Amino acid sequence: MKHTIYALTMFALAACTSPQEEAIDRHALVTRNNPEVTAMDSLSSLSVGNGEFAYTVDATGLQTFPEVYKNGVPLGTQSQWGWHSFGNPENYKPEEALVEYDFSHGHKELYATQPKEPGRAKEASDWYRVNPHRLHLGIIGLELENEVRPSDVQNIQQSLDMWNGIINSRFTLKETPYHIQTVCHPERDMIAARLSARQPAGIKFHFPYPTGGHCDDACNWEANDKHSTTLVSEDAQSAVLKRTLDATTYYVTISWEGAAKLREKSANYFVLTPTDSVFTFTCQFTPQASAAPILTFAEVQQASSGHWQNYWTQGAVADFSQCTDVRAKELERRVVLSQYLLAIQCAGSTPPQETGLTYNSWFGKFHLEMIWWHQAQFALWGHLELLDRTLSWYETVEPIARQIAERQGFKGIRWMKMTDPSGTEAPSKVGSFLIWQQPHLIYLAELLYRANPSEELKKKKKNKKKKPAEFMYSFATYEEEHDRYVLKGAIPAQETLRAAETVNPPFELSYWHFAMQVAQTWRERTGMERVPEWDVLIEKLSPLAYNDEQLYLAAETAVDTYKDIRFTSDHMAVLGAVGILPMNQLIHAGYMKNTLHWIWDNWNWDKTWGWDYPMTAMNAARMGEPEKAVSALLMDKRTNTYLVNGHNYQDGRLRIYLPGNGGLLTTVAMMCAGWDGSEGNNPGFPKDGKWNVRWEGLQPLP
């Protein structure tokens, strides 16, 4: 399958290219956007990784000052497999957090929510929200004398070479020049570093206990009695440590070149002290003891360079260097950095958390309504294998998703909102009532097929269309009085609305219409007949509700949409109905354009999220307003801030937000390559002569 996807991707790169005289200089494009850091700035940390594992460093090139960065972009060491649960001595069970609701679907529904009243149900809910949580696998940094402060690190010259996946860090410490190179292996959870200094410092390996916090660096340094780090084996050039945290264990394999001595400084704290002025080491994290051969720094560096050069040369690119609009340079920077960040943070064997593999948000769990924002772009930018790798996870948790649908009285499978690799549904007073994650798998599988229309892929993805569609049909309610289908009993993507009083949210209606059509088309592709009942649903879905001013409402029941700030804050999901999704029979183009203009002028933009700007831009592009599309992507708002490292800053809690990066890439692909029915090259950019965007390999949206 991998070889088939690769071959067709190469064909697509040749076919899906903007008109231009010569090939884009990809090396120049990538390297001119390499981030550079010249100060100990807690929001400017840099990362290396491979989608399964990531390691984030401060200005020293290692994790020397984690406390300084704790409230910025933390110095994380995280993986897809590294999870931990606190003990459950009370033997709480998931079903104890279930609460019965009646949303007039004709049956009772059980939801994993958050009871307010003290008692066992609330305790069970709290336990399953916190557990399991993602681990910080360990701090690897310079071991400095106690009196050394971050301000003592001077003359900082640090850069991330994205073409090769290596961080180069130069600085002076007490007048001693340091040069540290940091790299990650592309297929192992392993970092490698090379240190050059006249009087080299030691390397610390300091291991925390988890906090179980909602949003933090996952490092509790005050609980050494609750975990242990033992030296399992050691020789002149390597050592293996075993980590034990309650029922969780993992292994840390350290190897080095040259003379060095490993000592245990204190509980869960080891120091490796070299004697040579040039010193290299590697450190690998594994869930079980590893028998894999030990690698040198040079071998890891070579593997990294080959991996990243393949990534940049085999995928799609967009070059803004011939644009004369002053905003183009910044847009290109955001695009290239987002391509790098999403490959290291959001391309693993499980869906990514919103803060990737950098630090914990929502306890390190991932949100399935966000996977479209994180990963749809991989199908559009020529990295089908990265999207396909994650989608395989859905098959492993399908039995749990089926149980959720069954306990709520629906057919098919209902994907959980907030979860972990096991698929356990985390209780939530909001998330458990969302439904817009249900069509994502249909959409993402469709993007894979459009980029690689093979028989093998059709067979592989058939069930990914059928079973979610069965739930979607079952969830819709037929109203005989009005001869229509409605969607109700859900919190929409605009989460300021309430499940019990919301009927026909606009984005969900449009998404139901699109996904059910795709599901029917997929049946025909695979030699199956269309489901007649599904066609009736498609035909009789309620059109989007609007007011007397011909503005679309946040829901049919939200009649005060334009009078109540609750309805004009958070996600302007109505724009996603035409933007993320194509125009359909439920929508009047003129009314949607009116709605875009009102939102542009009046929305509570200070209460938005990073993906709201790409969503607005996609709507503007489809509505024939390319200047608004560009302006939305670069709107000067806090939650549309992109840091020096490319991360999308939101606020003091979410200092990085990868759905914003993913949305940016999806939108730029659409603005360049277009969408079904668009005309010409770069249809989402203004035709004022200032946006000569050159691109290669991008795919259009439906």
Which residues does each predicted region cover?
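Sec-dependent signal peptide recognition
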Residues: 2-8
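C-terminal motif of bacterial Sec signal peptides marking the signal peptidase cleavage site
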Residues: 14-15
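Active-site core of glycosidic bond-cleaving carbohydrate-active enzymes
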Residues: 63, 67-68, 83, 367-403, ...
